[in-house]
Amino acid sequence: MYISELGELWHRARVEPSIVHLDSAAASRSSNKVIEAVTAHLWRESERGGYVAQEQSSELLARTRRDIAALVGHTADELAFRESALAALRALLTYWNMPVSATVWVAPNEYGPNLDQFERRGYAVHTMPSTDGYGRVDTDALQNMLQFEQPDFIHVCHIGSHSGIVQPVAKIVELAHDAGVPVVVDAAQALGQVNCVTGADVVYGTSRKWVAGPRGVGFLATRSDSLRPVEIESSEAFIAGRIGLGVAVQELQSFGVEKIHRELAAIGKYTRERLFGVGSWELMEPVGEQSAIATLAPPPGWGPSDVVAARDRLRSIGILVTCAESWRAPLYTEQSVLRISPHLDLRRGHLDQLATELRGMGY
């Protein structure tokens, strides 16, 4: 039995999986229509030539641009395509006219590779205070800090790579703008999972996670009135993937984007309730967190290699999850966790099977 009322429709739109896929935060399963759209464009490229096929698909590409921009509260002319979320961030930091030794404030859940990009450019990185033990930004403390100091920009992962905590991005943007500070949002894990219209100056993300588009497609939306206009469209591109992303977004729209958000939050809650206290594994989010990602810290005495071994054990019996190591959130933790991230086609039996295996690994 599916957890979500959308589960059967989501499942029927895809090839039958050979595994229990609980890894949408890494890469969701694309639908048959997405795969067909990608394949059809590749055939057009072979038949007519790549650039001719791209030109003849201009209306499809324009719709994709409009639809993605709308999901993040931007206009089509503010959106550029790149190869991935990280490629989008690199392009932004390359073309933005930042001062030498710029200061950036980040949330505790900041993605490690993003921090590497800041470090390589000599930025001074400061962590915004957290309101709880989960790494959620304390917006009251942030408001107070902004009265006395303003960074060059704030960068926040709407949802991180290491846990399912949803940052209060809209409030962060409101406070930052009141202080004249621009905000950049990494929406890689958020797009398709939660509302990403926050008023941020810059939003970037990827196709392959909760939107269930193809790999190899990312985007960057930069407000026309932000720090500096950024012209960073990637011209040598996976055009078929962009068309596939457009189909994936249209499918989300057909289901109802807000309804998907609600259903995924309910799936996350059910997942946490089912796995709470299983085999000495510790749940790392509040049960009611409004995301579909659940992370489990290992039993006492386990090290990072043990969590990797647990992931490999699950994979060997056909259950796909991620070992989220500490490099994903180095400001927050030194601990590796198991990350469980089901999509709409989650069945109760999937979690029962996972719980049984986890119980056998614990105490």
Predicted segments with their positions:
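PLP-dependent enzyme catalytic core of the Aspartate aminotransferase-like
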Residues: 2-3, 316-317, 327-363
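Conserved PLP-dependent catalytic core of the aminotransferase class-I/II
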Residues: 63-67, 241, 245-284
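Active-site phosphate-binding strand-loop segment of PLP-dependent enzymes
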Residues: 133-187, 192
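Active-site PLP attachment segment
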Residues: 198-231, 238-240
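Conserved PLP-binding catalytic core of the aspartate aminotransferase-like
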Residues: 265, 269, 278-318, 324
